[in-house]
Amino acid sequence: MCRDCGCSLGPAAQRAPFAAAPSVPGKTATIEVITAILGENDRVAAHNREHFDQHGVLALNLMSSPGAGKTSLLEATIRALDGRLKVAVIEGDLATENDADRIRACGVPAVQITTGNACHLDAQMVHDAVHDLPLAGLDVLFIENVGNLVCPASFDLGQHRNVTLLSVPEGDDKPAKYPAMFRAAD
């Protein structure tokens, strides 16, 4: 479902035939145009946002490169909040529950989304995970996206704000190399 990497351009992608104007009289060409790739994602994202709003939950999408420190930042934030706000976390990773286990060890509910080969979370994944969390009484839901500086920027998950984390060892040129990600940050 990516505009950036094309990871969903398989048989499920919606395509519409488009007849191009012939460049040579009497010859025609057919070009496939991909339509509304993110339309269903955006619909589910709007539903997620309504759900968060109805429960008074602020949803934050945390994005960065793999290993930049998203989970460490969440652990430090949870400790700093010291119970003043009720929080929960949705963790996105290609494999393992390692990060979700770290968050649970902080005493916070966490749901793991294991994406397999998908390089980002989408709204339906978040929707499904939300049903495993106690939204009633929550103040903040952190969504830790899959570590990737390309694809996550294109997907509305229903979050209220996007946070992009940049680690010093990555180099200071990441915003120039991955402008969509840093423009998506609030």
Region roles according to the model:
Residues 137, 145, 152-170, 176-186:
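Inter-motif core of Ras-like GTPase G domains
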Residues 16, 20-50, 54-57, 68, ...:
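Nucleotide-state-sensitive switch-loop elements of NTP-binding domains
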Residues 1-23:
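Long, basic/Gly/Ser/Thr-rich N-terminal segments
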Residues 60-62:
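Hydrophobic anchor at the beta1->P-loop junction of P-loop NTPases
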Residues 10, 64-65, 146-148, 168-171:
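Short glycine-rich anion-binding loops that position phosphate/pyrophosphate groups of nucleotides
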Residues 73:
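Hydrophobic positions on the alpha1 helix immediately C-terminal to the Walker A/P-loop
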Residues 5, 113, 165:
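Hydrophobic residues at beta-strand termini and immediately following loops
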